Amino acid sequence: MTSRRSQEKSYAEAAAAPPPKESASSDVTPAVPADVIYKLLGFTAAMVVGPIGMYFVTVNSGGMSFFHQTSNFSLFETLTRIASPTVAGITAAITANLVLFGYIYVAWLDDREEREAASKRNEKKAQ
């Protein structure tokens, strides 16, 4: 009993063959719009530069030095100088959270605009 080999291409032949030509109406638009990428890059830069910059600005300014302009109370000045890295860390954390909330808000606005545009298109199709 001999079995006949099918006339179809083998796996190696199929893999080596060029892909079948697609129609000219294929969709070549990017999966993510460019403005979304630019916003993401901007917020990424803000997330890196903002908190680190605020940390060093706050550390170098002496923490809460604006509370004791011309005070002779040296204990308060000593405590604010000691707490300066702590205050700077808190400032950096607040800055990071503000950038994060800003990104979430901008993404929410973009999503809302897309939903409104989609609902308008659906209303036009229904008419």
From Swiss-Prot:
Q: What organism is listed for this UniProt entry?
A: Aspergillus fumigatus (strain ATCC MYA-4609 / CBS 101355 / FGSC A1100 / Af293) (Neosartorya fumigata)
User: Which Pfam families has this protein been placed in?
Assistant: VMA21 (PF09446)
Q: Which InterPro entries match?
A: Vma21
Locations listed in the record? Endoplasmic reticulum membrane; Endoplasmic reticulum-Golgi intermediate compartment membrane; Cytoplasmic vesicle, COPII-coated vesicle membrane
Q: Which GO terms describe its biological process?
A: vacuolar proton-transporting V-type ATPase complex assembly
Per UniProt, the keywords (alphabetical) are:
Cytoplasmic vesicle, Endoplasmic reticulum, Membrane, Transmembrane, Transmembrane helix
A cellular component term, taken from the record's GO annotations? endoplasmic reticulum-Golgi intermediate compartment membrane
Question: What is the name attached to this protein's record?
Answer: Vacuolar ATPase assembly integral membrane protein vma21
List the signal peptide residues. Answer: none
Q: How does it sit in the membrane?
A: Multi-pass membrane protein
- Transmembrane residues, as ranges? 40-60, 89-109
Q: What is the role of this chain? A: Required for the assembly of the V0 complex of the vacuolar ATPase (V-ATPase) in the endoplasmic reticulum.
Question: Motif span (Prevents secretion from ER)?
Answer: 124-127
Give start-end positions of Low complexity composition bias: 12-26
The Basic and acidic residues compositionally biased stretches are: 1-11
Q: Which family does it belong to?
A: Belongs to the VMA21 family.
Keyword DNA-binding carried by entry? no
Q: Which residues lie on this side of the membrane: Cytoplasmic?
A: 1-39, 110-127
Task: Extract the ranges annotated as region (Disordered).
Answer: 1-28
Q: Which residues lie on this side of the membrane: Lumenal?
A: 61-88
